[in-house]
Amino acid sequence: MTVSTTSLCTPIVKICGLTVEAAHCAISSGADLIGMILVPDLKRTVQQTKLKAISRAVTRIPGVPTSPSRGIDRPSHGLVRGTFSADYTSWPLVVGVFRNQSLDEVLRMLRNYDLDIVQLHGSEPLHQWTREIPVPVIKKFGLGEDDLMAPGLHAVTLLDGGAGGEGQKISWEGLPGSGAFMLAGGLTVDNVAVAVKIPNVAGVDVSSGVATDGMQDLEKNCRCLFRNAKGW
């Protein structure tokens, strides 16, 4: 694996939050995508009572610019310019994370919680679903899976270890040599600065890597993660 010494563009940074407070911290720190895990019965699944509040918090934090015209540092990677920027004029965006749920459930939650992006972590039939889901789709893959970089099936490829969201690190040595993608799996405050310099990594997706005993450490890990990922 070759790691460049400088970053040519601002990477996308996505973080999953459990609470409104976590979303506030992530946004003020520079998050581009705020994820809500909507898979039932996982440790990091967002409680139903908090979903709407987190979604609303993304665009209603006083003093935090949500429009590029008001100075927010939008991610500059070409993957974002070609995928998200034409559709959205404000940042950050809300991402709903699903795994092997029905299409009806995905569409219902998309409408109910004003999701900007759908992220699929299971064995969903992309050929059918991407025609039905009216927002960009981030699709999780493991290394070597079929359709990993197939054009037209999904907006963004996410490479992750295991089922995803479990902190299982993916082998960086086997990452694709072409085509932009987002990287997840075992990313932490300590290694994210290296991860964003790997060729073709357009962004990072972090969840358990900013947790302390299962709870997000808002003042330390979260803010430090964004400083390291963005190079601020």
UniProtKB/Swiss-Prot annotation:
Keyword check for ATP-binding: no
GO biological process: L-tryptophan biosynthetic process
Keyword tags: Amino-acid biosynthesis, Aromatic amino acid biosynthesis, Isomerase, Tryptophan biosynthesis
GO-annotated molecular function: phosphoribosylanthranilate isomerase activity
Reaction catalysed by this enzyme: N-(5-phospho-beta-D-ribosyl)anthranilate = 1-(2-carboxyphenylamino)-1-deoxy-D-ribulose 5-phosphate
Family to which this protein belongs: Belongs to the TrpF family.
Protein name, entry field: N-(5'-phosphoribosyl)anthranilate isomerase
Native source species: Lipomyces starkeyi (Oleaginous yeast)
Upper lineage: Eukaryota, Fungi, Dikarya, Ascomycota, Saccharomycotina
